[in-house]
Amino acid sequence: MNLTDVITGTPVTSEELRAARDRRILKKWELLSAGDGSCLVEFSLNIAGAVKVFPFARAAFREELRELQEKLGRFSIKNTKICEEPTGDHAFFLLDSPEIPVKQFLVSIEESHPLGRLFNLDVYGLDGVSVKRQDLHLLPRTCLVCGGDANTCLAQKRHSMELIQWQTAKLFNDHFRDRSADLAASAAVRGQLYEVSTTPKPGLVDRNNSGSHSDMDFFTFLDSSASLIPWFREFFCLGWDHADEADEQIFERLRYAGQRAETAMFSATHGINTHKGLVFASAILCGALGKVHAGKSLPLPAEEVLSECRKLGSCSLGDLAKLSRHQNKLSPASSIDMNSQDSRGSMPMDTKNHPPQAEPSALSNGERIFSAYGIQGARGEAAAGFPSAVRIGLPALKKWLAAGFSLNDAAAMALLTLISEADDTNMVHRGGPELAKKSKEQAKHL
């Protein structure tokens, strides 16, 4: 996201700001004179410039407002007034508590919250006089730009408006990006854990056995899942931070991050491939989520996210096209060994810098399947917006959950639905297309 796009909205005039200030003063005295409180808290955001309200500012105001409504309860809230207007959002809390402990508590928020430097949390006694930090023998607030005394920097105009606004935009951007990235990573790893925990699963690792995988077990998957958490976050941040770039550029960034994620996975599993395909799919999905979320607030439009998945996923098809052209030049004797084991990552090869070779060791499982049978596999799924998950797996899962089945049983039956209807390159890799077709037919009758 371009930081210059953060603070955009309707500018207000100095006359409008003065009128808004006068209204707040009247409201302050109205609440203080009501006679049922001991002090008054005023909450607003410290936004420099003529634009006082924009999406991140309003989201931050509402987020902190919810926290204050909960945490100020210990001080006995007697009245609350909330106002959202173009001159700046603000709220009043009339409390039945001495002002000093309230001020101490609010200073801790200003000092510890990621956006605390942008919070104005003022406390007034019944005489209308605000409690100052120096009254509590505390240091003054620090400058948003240089970390010095904020009052001194303001009085001496040490920093330009542009620099102050840039730093403000960065604080907002980093806060909401990091929080959203954490949510995306949490959802991704939760999906991994749900998948491996679903029991029973034909031929796959679950809580009871390792299926057809003699080199791994349930705990191998847990180790792998834990190692990938920071990379799900990284995929999201790459999409968010570079949302203004072309999809091809974002994909190259995701490719490199995905290869590093696979290295982390192999390190955690001692060289065992547990989640290569999922790393590719998660890079596309989390990257798409980050790119879309950079310009929109929650809830994100699902179709827009899937559309971005299609764009990013389509970038990987170029590798298969280059591979196909290269394979056409090979002699008939240069065949692909479908039984060779791949020890590399499954993020698509950088064919620009590493042209595909005929040797099996240079190809991933997906590339060998494509070379032998023309099946696009995970790349094709991503380029189409993950239709197997969206149109087959998710509806099946919702159907069985709505019918009253447990999450475990609904997930197991959704898996059988996927096996019976979707093409699985792992089954093709292990037994060839005929056995994969037979397995699909068998799954339909389970």
Language-model segments: residues:
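Generic non-transmembrane alpha-helical segments
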Residues: 67, 71, 105-108, 112, ...
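Short, well-structured hydrophobic secondary-structure segments
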Residues: 40-98, 217, 221-243
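Catalytic cofactor-binding cores of redox enzymes
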Residues: 120-123, 129-138, 144, 266-294, ...
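A contiguous pocket-lining binding segment that forms or flanks enzyme active sites
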Residues: 91-108, 405
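Long, contiguous binding/interaction regions
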Residues: 2-69, 108-176
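Long, hydrophobic/aromatic-enriched structural stretches that serve as scaffold segments
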Residues: 233-291
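Short, conserved charged micro-motifs
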Residues: 53-54, 99-106, 298-301
